[in-house]
Amino acid sequence: MKQTIILLYGGRSAEREVSVLSAESVMRAVDYDRFTVKTFFISQSGDFIKTQEFSHDPGQEDRLMTNETIDWDKKVAPSAIYEEGAVVFPVLHGPMGEDGSVQGFLEVLKMPYVGCNILSSSLAMDKITTKRVLESAGIAQVPYVAIVEGDDVTAKIAEVEEKLAYPVFTKPSNMGSSVGISKSENQEELRQALELAFRYDSRVLVEQGVNAREIEVGLLGNYDVKSTLPGEVVKDVAFYDYDAKYIDNKITMDIPAKISDDVVAVMRQNAETAFRAIGGLGLSRCDFFYTDKGEIFLNELNTMPGFTQWSMYPLLWDNMGISYPELIERLVDLAKESFDKREAHLI
């Protein structure tokens, strides 16, 4: 009997378009001799829409539903995704997707799901909290200042100017895919950057700008996590912003990255240590800065990285000999393994 995968995609965050691309890729890559795929679209308003089911390879004309093509007659209660024995693959990015909220919902439904649990998802989604946890694990971070809504902004800007040097990068703490991130060269630009970042979150991170290569490591596993050789993001723009990342295709990837064996070893070890520090499960992508001074800074952990067939995470594993369809199978198996362990702990 075939295993059912429930594919959740879309979502309420600014990254919903990325989610659709990832879900389409998964839907086309699945081994339909082993799996049946049922898809549910989460609209921008948070409604669940029952969309297509696939028991064999979809045709080129098959497209997943989006906000532009919603059939509201197919709206269902969120709990309608439940199917005994099915595994949920929440291909959701950003807030209300990989921040622990959907993971908590799926645990209430008592369904296995791909990826990190409530704790590790919510922790990794918040950049400030992640930095504090990784600091406690002894992992080097880019110098930063945290600013929370209600803080004296003028005093915080003074702290930034005391501890850091321009240029600095300002980021919403709880957002991904470079949404709301700005580079500032002076105080006036920093004030504008803070205003933008606070539109997306009530907690904001200001980081020291560094001249660095962006190196990424893939992680796969539960308590026996394994890492990939690193890959490098090669950019044609000033920084890896949302448009460059997903719309303009102004980036290329160098896999494996051209760095020394010693640097590779440190990055892989730090990535695995970070994954364990947050209690990660299933998958993550760990992003590093490798500065022109030879410093290695862990930038962030993405618990549901971009998952199209041309995204960095699947390509990193392809370089390690695990194909995209096989990667999906492994993630489903890991989801069932972590579900069984979680259920056993409740007895």
Curated annotation (Swiss-Prot):
From the record, what ranges are coiled-coil? none
Q: Where does Mg(2+) 2 bind?
A: E300, N302
Question: Which amino acids does the record list as binding Mg(2+) 1?
Answer: D287, E300
Mind naming one GO cellular-component term on file for this protein? Answer: cytosol
For this chain's record, the cofactor binding note is: Binds 2 magnesium or manganese ions per subunit.
UniProt-listed HAMAP family: Dala_Dala_lig
Protein name stated in the entry: D-alanine--D-alanine ligase
This protein's gene is called ddl
